[in-house]
Amino acid sequence: MSDYKETLNLPETGFPMRGNLANREPVMLKHWYDEDLYGEIRKAKKGKKSFILHDGPPYANGDIHIGHALNKILKDIIIKSKTLSGFDAPYIPGWDCHGLPIELMVEKKKGKPGQKISAAEFREECRKYAAVQVEGQKESFKRLGIMGEWDKPYRTMDFGTEANIIRSLGKIADQGHLLKGFKPVHWCTDCGSALAEAEVEYQDKFSPSIDVRFVAADEAATLAKFSTPEGHQGEGELSVVIWTTTPWTLPANRAVALHADLEYVLVQVEAHGEQKAERLILASELAKSVMDRAGIEHFHNLGFAKGSELELLQFNHPFYGFTVPAILGEHVTVDSGTGIVHTAPGHGQEDFVVGKKYDLEIANPVGSNGVYLPDTELFAGQHVFKANDSVIDVLKEKGALLHHHAIEHSYPHCWRHKTPIIFRATPQWFISMDQAGLRAKALEEVKSVEWMPEWGQSRIEGMIEGRPEWCISRQRTWGVPIALFVHKETSELHPDSLELIEKVAKLVEEKGIQAWWDLDIAELMGEDDATKYEKVLDTLDVWFDSGVTHFSVVDSREEYNFPQEERTHSADLYLEGSDQHRGWFQSSLISSVAMKGKAPYRQVLTHGFVVDGNGRKMSKSVGNVVAPKDVTNKLGADILRLWVASTDYTNEVAVSDEILKRSADAYRRIRNTARFFLANLNGFNPETDIVPAEEMVALDRWAVGRAFAAQEEIIKSYDEYNLHEVTQRLMHFCSIEMGSFYLDVIKDRQYTAKKSGHAQRSCQTALYYIVEALVRWMAPIMSFTADEIWNEMPGKRDKFVFTGEWYEGLFDLAEGEDLNNEFWSKIQAVRASVNKLLEAARGEKVIGGSLQAEITLYADDALAAKINKLDNELRFVLLTSSATVKPLSEKSDSAKATELDGLFVDVAASEAAKCERCWHHVADVGTIEGHEEVCGRCVSNVEGEGEERKFA
């Protein structure tokens, strides 16, 4: 027997069954960088059609988390698939490097600027800190197998990028979109700075809910509006009632707002017990609910009036000695409250807008630290949130408080400090959404973009329609300066602003943003102007920094310098989490439309947030955090990459140890399929051993055809960014089409056919074609494993799979072929039915293995005609030692029905001897002299010309 073992074509490969990825991947990674793989890809793709995926910059602070890994892996898969599709797709990773979180970290170590450390030194410390953070994150991203311009990423703090951010501001100002205004903005009292929309998050908070009386200044004039008849005008004090959850804003109250079209009622509160008689004005729809919460049971209506009739009536401020007007506003509703809104133009966006219309004072008695200014009557020196109780006490004392209780509601918080914020009117710089038609143009451009998923379009449209002006100024130290000069008396911009901005940008390009603070104005504009103008000392919102990277990076980097006729937009694709509709997607769109009149991207693709296996947010306190480093150290990056590609990432993306274990199981199945291919290509040289397609065994041609069909679907799914469809198709191909059928059937031929004979070489030709395609399908997702396979494959090839393109050597079966796809589908159905009966026979101890079986198939005429096309090779497809086809009319009593109509099968144990080489039970075993242990087929395969196979 041992002599015959040497004659078998046994599989052999250096590609191990176990991936051992955690140890093997770092070695491969070093090889990639030693050989400059990214540079090799760029050389190979030079001159090809371009594809630009522009990286949204993560913030340079802390370790990367699983959301970062999801985002960067998705981008890398898409870039690699585009490269294989023949695109030149450079990838320049970026980092957001200015802003408050870095300032806070440096403050902890060095103190606040202007105290223990100068502002210039503080900026330098921030720059150093950010650089260290970038390097840490960079190594983590590289470990995930992400290819890119890691030696020259973009950082918003690079001098050239800072200069281009300043130039962007100049372009926006030049297009007429810049606005200086004293407006209420989101203000964090802990940051001591304005916040952008994207820096605000909403959390539940308990607040005092109060109903407050504003007594009518002219009772007769007010009563007249309600047309109450003589003698029925009621009794007691006459007031409008406002409702608010921010008592601290009442010192800044300058009006009460009603809706022009709402009906208001004059309610007589009757004297009853301790309740005094009084008259209250409320929205008719809300009067009952106000009375209920105030505990007033005895009341009746005196008269009604439209909101429009009450305009400009005067009411006394509840604790200051001045009157405020009744005004009309569209923002007033009857969803809650009293239908009358307390209006403080310095503390609310809607209040500000309506206040401008009525020329109200925009009072702001609150300092940047959230404390009332020294001249604030009654409340000077108190922090606004602590002052709520003081305000309520004063209202009680003045008899102005109708009712108060605590409510829990959604309230804006600072995204960094997680503390409640306020609206506060301050002089700020804005990008105006309407003064030069920016909102309308942005909405028009939204329609030209392909949003994936589609709901992204309506989401961003709603946000742009409703958003206020973009407040781009910050009162911070570590940021790109708003490099403008304003007139000391009029606050007007210098008439040569664009020219001056370019001069400043050139200085910043050379020395960084510190050049602005070191700048002597006279050197830039001459002594005369220098006496009249001063520098703006605010810095830019970090969302402006990242928002203008379509210009500061994409339009400016040499790597993206493609022929203009190819480019319809700065970038082809932006890909970030779905929270970026209110963040980076929006800041990029607004700035690009403001600068260039068009969207910066052709497509926008969003992914959901990562949650645990139970759908809960990742949280250290819950203990459900999955760190990318832990996964790569334990399972390897390819498992993490396969997890990313296996999920429908447009929804929430779940991860847990169990989910990653499932990815590891799927990985093993794919790896083992690839290993089978490689092991059975042992001894195959594609330059000399390829069998022409028309001469290949029919089943081998079918297998290549299945790979051809799979490749078409896989490339289409890659092109449409449906990565989970890629992995599903890949798994189906490996497990079902190959593993459950083709690879199972060909083992006999591959192992036992004549070494280097036609039957074996046909099979190896198919395996070679398929693995050439398979390794490329895998490469964008399981990059390390694909590279490992590539290095074990036979034949001459490029150094790396990543520099090539999809394999073009596959071919499909023609539908006109006799043994076409439909034929092989039917044969697989027959095989599945036979296998069930073989399993049953094995369970009943009729046979041991399937090769011990002799089967007879009783088939109807149509099915018999199909099966008979395989002639005497049917047994190889069914993995039995003998298979005979007979008409259904001759069916024996022992034949059993199958799941297929028109097919019965009789399973019997073979009485023939077993061939010690191929294990088939065949009548001619022992009949050939000198080869008593083997069958005639094996003798031919060992010493003769080898068996002939046509079909299987």
Curated annotation (Swiss-Prot):
Name of the protein described by the UniProt record: Isoleucine--tRNA ligase
GO biological process: isoleucyl-tRNA aminoacylation
Comment text on domains: IleRS has two distinct active sites: one for aminoacylation and one for editing. The misactivated valine is translocated from the active site to the editing site, which sterically excludes the correctly activated isoleucine. The single editing site contains two valyl binding pockets, one specific for each substrate (Val-AMP or Val-tRNA(Ile)).
Organism expressing this protein natively: Aliivibrio salmonicida (strain LFI1238)
Residue ranges of the motif 'HIGH' region: 58-68
Binding-site residues for Zn(2+), renumbered to this chain: C915, C918, C935, C938
Highest taxon of source: Bacteria
Cofactor: Zn(2+)
Listed EC numbers: 6.1.1.5
PROSITE patterns for this protein: AA_TRNA_LIGASE_I
